[in-house]
Amino acid sequence: MAKVIGIDLGTTNSCVSVMEGGNPVVITNSEGARTTPSVVSFQDNGERLVGQIAKRQAITNPHKTIMSIKRYMGTDHKETIDGKEYTPQELSAIILQKLKADAEAYLGGTVTQAVITVPAYFNDSQRQATKDAGRIAGLEVLRIINEPTAASLAYGLDKMDTNQKILVYDLGGGTFDVSILELGDGVFEVKSTNGNTKLGGDDFDQRIIDHIAETFKKDSGIDLRTDKMALQRLKEAAEKAKIELSSSTQTNINLPFITADATGPKHIDMNLTRAKFNELTQDLVEGTLTPMKKALQDAEMSIGEIDKVILVGGSTRIPAVQDAVKNFTGKEPSKDVNPDECVAMGAAVQAGVLTGDVKDVLLLDVTPLTLGIETLGGVATPLIERNTTIPTRKSQVFSTAADGQTSVEIHVVQGERQMAADNKTLGRFTLSGIAPAPRGIPQIEVTFDIDANGIVNVSAKDKGTGKEANITITASTNLSDDEVEKAVNDAKKFEEEDKKRKESVEVKNNAEQIFYQTEKTLNELGDKVSAEDKATIEEKLNALKGVKDGEDIEAIKKATEDLTQAFYQISSKIYQDAGAPGAEGFDSNMAGEANAGQNANNDDNVVDADYKVEDDEK
């Protein structure tokens, strides 16, 4: 049976895991790392880079490098690259393709199914967008699971015989979530969740960027934030400084030749202390405390009832964040899970539950936001309150607002505000064919259905006429089926193009290697090769030389094969002559050199510096 992978599709970094031997295992990527930067870069030659290789060249290619696209999931934001528009779903799919390919390389087979995590506070549009991204990447998304819940699965898999109340504090690159769970007898029950989808490590970086930029502007009068290349250098320096300040009390920010004016080049060389960093980001840290209070209130628990505190997300390594959590909870956070990997591992556990590989685990998650409809006066009338266990179904009867009304528009909203206009619109649909009657007489039953992914379906039925209408919520920011299908086909096309490009370069590299080895060996053999044979080889060498730098791959393959076969025949003759009485001994290693080119691509000592492959742009 094919494996189902667990994916943590993060704002700044992503991770993929799979169940092996009853435990989740993190899959290393093609570069040997356990996490992959969520960065996509488009090259001038049409190649797409993903991950660390894309991040490395961001300074020289800032206009075509996309970072933190997760922050725009579920919105109508688009990135335009070389005249083509890309949605957040399509860009996220490129990252997912990379993770999928790394998993396939590790598992040695095709991967078609996955469990993907999202921030607990993601709304319906954001969840739908994540599912669409998976589909575009060629993955059937079996389940969307909340990140803090996934982290608790990774934490609690080997502690199922204990009863614990857990607080999961998840501060990632772009989002913040807190969830309260009860763990006991294999049941992981989410009691409440809260958060902020616009708060994360990127915001901490931005404070450093602004501090550097403002200081530089004060000294030079130049605002570096208007220069994309300089801004990218600031971003890298800010992230590096933030990381260094987690282990030291001061760091140096040195950016020579950051810009220039009429007076000459300008440089940045400044120190940033941890105390200053804490001052710059104090409100961000404090902004995580209110959601914790709300989550505890909704769970009807006091902080004293919490047994364990789990920190998730790379941003929880910031000392001020750890201190804030420690002071709020009065507990030392658990070190049982890796904050960068536990979400993907938990997703793999959930995948194991769905496939039957993991037994005796039951996950009960909740919907993070209240769902309702707009009623008379623009009021948001709730049908399903936040923190309701999912999957769930709830119905309520409404009526018409005017005499003789024959249709009603159902306006579906998500959020905690009293007025519909202040909440997130998930969608609208119309129920027609209502029998004319005085206002308040018709009975219209509205039913909300939330599946295990947290995705909403709504139906309305006129109990008098039996007329019915329903909608699977697809907000205007989501892609239609046709758009998803087109994106899927585009992704496949790019995958094929990249495979061809990769094959082309491998063929060229092989040709170059064989050409070099044959020419070298021919010179070393000297008069051991007859003039006639030498002329034959030189003819084949010239033929390969004439095509090896071109684009006709079949011609390169043929010329390479012709040269290889011709040299094999001469090698055989030399061996025969070497074995004849009185013949000089022949060094077989020389002939072996000719064969080396055939396996050039498998030789760890061969470096093909003219091409970088980021495993089919996954």
From Swiss-Prot:
It comes from the Bacteria. It holds the Pfam family HSP70. Induction: By stress conditions e.g. heat shock. GO terms for molecular function: ATP binding; ATP-dependent protein folding chaperone; unfolded protein binding. Residues 591-604 have a biased composition (Low complexity). The modification Phosphothreonine is found at T175. The keyword DNA-binding does not apply. InterPro entries: ATPase_NBD, Chaperone_DnaK, Heat_shock_70_CS, HSP70_C_sf, HSP70_peptide-bd_sf, Hsp_70_fam. Keywords: ATP-binding, Chaperone, Nucleotide-binding, Phosphoprotein, Stress response. CDD domains: ASKHA_NBD_HSP70_DnaK-like (cd10234). Belongs to the heat shock protein 70 family. Acts as a chaperone. PANTHER family: HEAT SHOCK PROTEIN 70KDA. NCBIfam families: PRK00290.1, prok_dnaK. HAMAP family: DnaK. This is Chaperone protein DnaK.
